[in-house]
């Protein structure tokens, strides 16, 4: 019997865009990600790259804000329109810190993660639960998202209930 290809499940829901990430180009992991010199190399804030065809369909232009969302949550990022991105792909560089997003959001809110039971133990310094602890640094390549224009209305959602006692949000 020959092996057959089976499509991967669409993590995050049945949305039109594949959320793809790669290593940050202008930092060493998240180190120096928010220094003025490095920010000048990359428009100064988180951005998601999409194809011109997709941008036209959605109704967004280069450098406008858009809402990126799926079943896990929603965030806002600036759009970077590029012909280098394949249609149907939303591409971003990882390692942006939540304080660099509007309203302290994070791209990690859209990424499924596996719960590590050790993180459920509390009160031990480095072992504590806070937002974004369950998600990996980069998107699983099967993560799906939708994108729509954002014109200033509030879209803030939390993927899990906000913990007022968490210190690392």
Residue spans of the language-model regions?
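Long, low-complexity segments enriched in small/aliphatic residues
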Residues: 1-36
